[in-house]
């Protein structure tokens, strides 16, 4: 929100704590709206269950998934404690307005497979993440079947490769489709690149 940041700058700022994760990446980060459009195009072609896994802390991505669920006529269900926690916190802070209400997973499992979309934690293959439990068949409410689609709307954090590839191998063995940033445009970083940071410092 360029105008809002400029107004903050006009009031006078003594110090600012800023995200510098992608400071060494030249140029600008990709647009979340472009990812949203790409995800929608992908989901419109799917006829069975869709499960998207992403970082729970990426509220913009969460909003994009809710948007896609509504546009494709699907109900949405959140899976994983941190996903529920971030959703509630974001709503409390005034974000995620005008979205469809998520279903409890116990309700969601009764929905026709072409009418449900899950948003789950565990995109890095974490042993206790929701994705691992779903894929291993140990989740009490959520399951996947042959022909369903899993979208990894995230990047691999260095060091997590083995865990994640083991998880994805298990998904493939179950004849479930995998879509990730390796074969489709389903993720942009939530961290600003160098030129984005220059703009923000200039505005503030």
What is the predicted function of each stretch?
Residues 1-110, 129-139, 162-164:
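His/Asp/Glu-rich metal-coordinating catalytic cores
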Residues 67, 71, 90-204:
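C-terminal regulatory/interaction regions
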């Amino acid at each position: 929100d360029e105008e809002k940041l400029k107004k903050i700058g006009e009031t006078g700022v003594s110090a600012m704590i800023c995200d510098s994760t992608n400071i060494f990446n030249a140029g600008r980060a990709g647009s979340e709206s472009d990812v949203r459009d790409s995800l929608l195009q992908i989901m419109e072609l799917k006829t069975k269950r869709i499960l998207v896994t992403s970082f729970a802390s990426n509220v913009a991505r969460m909003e994009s998934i809710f948007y896609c669920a509504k546009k494709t006529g699907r109900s949405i269900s959140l899976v994983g404690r941190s996903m529920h926690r971030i959703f509630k916190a974001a709503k409390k802070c005034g974000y995620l307005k005008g979205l469809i209400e998520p279903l409890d997973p116990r309700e969601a499992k009764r929905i026709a497979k072409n009418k449900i979309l899950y948003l789950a934690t565990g995109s890095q293959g974490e042993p206790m993440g929701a994705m691992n439990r779903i894929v291993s068949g140990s989740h009490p409410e959520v399951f996947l079947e042959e022909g369903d689609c899993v979208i990894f709307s995230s990047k691999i954090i260095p060091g997590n490769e083995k865990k994640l590839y083991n998880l994805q191998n298990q998904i493939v063995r179950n004849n479930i489709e995998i879509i990730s940033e390796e074969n489709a445009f389903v993720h942009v970083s939530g961290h600003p690149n160098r030129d984005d940071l220059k703009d923000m410092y200039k505005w503030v």
